[in-house]
């Protein structure tokens, strides 16, 4: 059997490089938001109110329901949470 190693799970799962990079960025935002929510708010209801979403959206985020979140939605939530979002664009 031939084993391959990948730097990121999306490198293994997605062949399309455009989708793969989008997935990586969304994953990073979701992880950061979930950690921030866990460390900042008393409960999901409080987090939802602060982030301008419903409690079920917070639950979906914490469950890692990846396909339920667009990149712009995650950026909006991060900014409402007081997080700083930066973009680093570079040519390959």
What spans do the regions from the language model cover?
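Short glycine/serine/threonine/alanine-rich loop segments
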Residues: 42, 53, 83
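Short, charged recognition helix plus adjacent turn
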Residues: 89-92
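Residues at secondary-structure transition points
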Residues: 20-24, 28, 42, 68, ...
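Recognition helix of helix-turn-helix/homeodomain-like DNA-binding domains
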Residues: 51-67
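Short basic helix-loop element that most often maps to the first helix and adjoining turn
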Residues: 31-50
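DNA major-groove recognition helix of helix-turn-helix/homeodomain DNA-binding modules
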Residues: 71-87
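Helix-turn-helix DNA-binding elements, focusing on the entry/boundary residues of the two helices
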Residues: 43-44, 55, 74
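N-terminal flexible/basic segments that precede or flank functional cores
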Residues: 1-32
